Amino acid sequence: VSLVVPPYPPARYTADEPEVSAWLKRADAPPDYQSPAGVSYHYLANQQATDGDYGLYRVDIAPAGGGPGPHFHRAMSEAFFVLSGTMRLYDGTDWVDGHQGDFLYVPPGGVHGFRNEVEEPASILMLFAPGAPREAYFEGFGALADMTDDERREWFVRHDNYWV
């Protein structure tokens, strides 16, 4: 059996000496944003912190806290890793229960959704690659109620969110 190994990408750090540039975000840090619906967003590594490589977020969803229905993104992939609780995950065909340790990868254009339907909290890691300014998306939901239909459509397109 022969294993085909793709090449590594070109070097991005080319200095002769290493640098001290790592940073740590503690698990007990307060959320970066708490939505009125009871969703806590922890911005673990956003677009600015990763130079656009990816965005990684821990999302803690209240019991029966819902979530987005089927949608897709044109500019980025998205991945979900269930940390705790039960999340309903939509893979473009079926809604399935995702439990601790389950993983869903969605390439650009892939239909997906997620939600917490049970009476227990759930927590997931969400990864977007390349990174995008998702913080404005998460924090902007409160303004949707005051928008016209056209403004709402434009807002979702601006945030690379296309409903199915």
Each predicted region: which residue ranges?
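Hydrophobic small-molecule pocket/channel-lining residues, especially in calycin-type beta-barrels
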Residues: G66-G67, H73, M87, G113, ...
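A short, N-terminal "cap"/entry segment at the start of jelly-roll beta-barrel domains
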Residues: V1-G55, L144-V164
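A generic structural motif
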Residues: Y90, R115-E117
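Glycine- and acidic-residue-biased ligand/ion/polar-headgroup-sensing regions
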Residues: A75-M87, G92
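Short acidic-glycine-tyrosine-enriched beta hairpin
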Residues: T93-V111
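A generic "binding-loop/recognition-motif" signal
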Residues: A75, D94, G110-V111, E120, ...
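Conserved short histidine dyad/triad with adjacent acidic residue
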Residues: V39-A45, Y57-H73
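Double-stranded beta-helix
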Residues: E117-V164
